[in-house]
């Protein structure tokens, strides 16, 4: 659905890793070729006709480009592929078409790439290599196993419009694909604080950002609502699938929660996560999403599909004030020790999107926003300071992600 809604060509994601040494392009080329061989389902081109998008196998090498600038996937410079690797000095960039997989799927790819770059012959449990064949569980989409619903017979409640920060503050879109503000929080400062307040990194950041927005708009009238992205693979019993398997938990920061101390707020958010991310609820939500996607696929032509998908996505945008996405802590410390920084960039919608990565003892917060003004980000820094948390700022820059040519 998102694919058709963003058919203007920017539904991509860039993972920006700063490594511990200057990159050897020859070693990286070898690592990239082995990684591409391990992930044939990512080595495709995206095509479209008058009716639909579709994938086509691409046997050309995955592009390796010496640049830190934005590139175009699906174009000649990237051999028509939906992903590519760029580098500049000690900076590594993985550009990836988000319609093919989510952050969990992309992390597996990145782990394999870094494994072949740094280790190759040494066994690191859990990393997919050429010695671990692609399984049926890896390629199967669990949503295909869910029943299709007749959505015309279901009366879905319309969620109320949430507080929109741009509208409330009268801010203008900065242009391009938005801005990224980079913030690093040491784990040895953040994790004990998070645990002592009954939180997790993603939940704690969701709460702190809500409190930050309250600092700026203490008298707001529209509800302050956030979405927290969760990995649905465990609930769908499809831990190994590469397909997009995300769902969202909805947090309402209402008057009752506003009056609570931080620990109680985190407890409430944990409870909401437990209830909304249980197996039955997730399967029900993914069934609706899968049915909606199939309904769009069954529409007669491309333009109709794009219009319906865009309308559906815009409805979800109006129901949230911001989104927090946290894939989870990096699983492979042998590789993680080589990663100095880990930033995640994606085009920004009508509200802030906070992408969180945790690796090598640090939490990297990519605060993505569609406007120039820093008031909400600065309010988050005030929350960190008042709670005695350490942090390091890495500046602000335009979001630099690939377009995709179809």
Language model segments and positions:
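Acyl-thioester-dependent acyl-group transfer interface
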Residues: 1-52, 60-84, 215-406
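Short, well-ordered loop/turn elements at secondary-structure boundaries
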Residues: 87-89, 199, 318
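Acyl activation and transfer enzymes in specialized metabolism, enriched
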Residues: 20-39, 95-111, 180-219, 324, ...
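Short leucine-rich amphipathic alpha-helices used at interfaces
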Residues: 2-6, 72-73, 78-80, 85-86, ...
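Non-catalytic, low-complexity flexible loops and terminal extensions
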Residues: 100-108, 112-192, 384-406
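Histidine-centered acyl-transfer/condensation active-site motif
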Residues: 77-119, 129-139, 357-376
């Amino acid at each position: 659905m998102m694919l058709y809604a963003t058919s203007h060509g920017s539904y991509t994601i860039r993972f920006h890793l700063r490594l511990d040494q200057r990159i050897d392009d020859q070693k990286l080329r070898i690592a990239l070729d082995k990684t591409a061989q391990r992930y044939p389902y990512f080595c495709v081109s995206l095509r479209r006709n008058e009716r639909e998008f579709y994938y086509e196998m691409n046997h050309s090498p995955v592009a390796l480009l010496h640049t830190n600038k934005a590139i175009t996937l699906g174009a000649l410079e990237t051999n028509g592929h939906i992903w590519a690797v760029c580098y500049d000095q000690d900076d590594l960039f993985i550009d990836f078409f988000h319609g093919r997989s989510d952050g969990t799927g992309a992390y597996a790819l990145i782990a394999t790439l870094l494994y072949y770059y740094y280790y190759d012959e040494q066994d690191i449990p859990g990393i997919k290599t050429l010695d671990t064949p692609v399984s049926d569980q890896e390629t199967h989409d669990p949503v295909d196993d869910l029943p299709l619903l007749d959505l015309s017979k279901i009366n879905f409640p319309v969620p109320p419009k949430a507080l929109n920060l741009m509208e409330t503050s009268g801010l203008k879109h900065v242009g391009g694909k938005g801005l990224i503000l980079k913030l690093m929080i040491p784990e040895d400062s953040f994790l004990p604080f998070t645990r002592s307040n009954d939180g997790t990194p993603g939940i704690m950041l969701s709460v702190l950002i809500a409190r930050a927005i309250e600092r700026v708009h203490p008298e707001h009238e529209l509800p302050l609502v956030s979405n927290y992205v969760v990995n649905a693979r465990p609930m769908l019993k499809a831990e190994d699938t590469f397909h997009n398997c995300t769902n969202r938990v909805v947090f309402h920061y209402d008057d009752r929660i506003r009056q609570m101390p931080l620990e109680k707020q985190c407890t409430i958010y944990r409870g909401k996560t437990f209830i909304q991310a249980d197996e039955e609820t997730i399967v029900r939500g993914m069934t609706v999403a899968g049915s909606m996607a199939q309904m769009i696929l069954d529409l007669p032509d491309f333009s109709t599909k794009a219009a319906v998908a865009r309308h559906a996505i815009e409805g979800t945008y109006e129901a949230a004030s911001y989104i927090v996405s946290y894939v989870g802590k990096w699983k492979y410390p042998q590789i993680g020790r080589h990663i100095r920084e880990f930033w995640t960039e994606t085009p920004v919608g009508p509200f802030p999107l906070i992408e969180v990565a945790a690796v090598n003892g640090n939490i990297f917060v990519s605060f993505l926003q569609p406007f120039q003004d820093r008031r909400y980000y600065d309010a988050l820094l005030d929350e960190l300071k008042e709670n005695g948390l350490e942090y390091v700022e890495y500046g602000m820059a335009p979001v630099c992600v690939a377009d995709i040519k179809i």
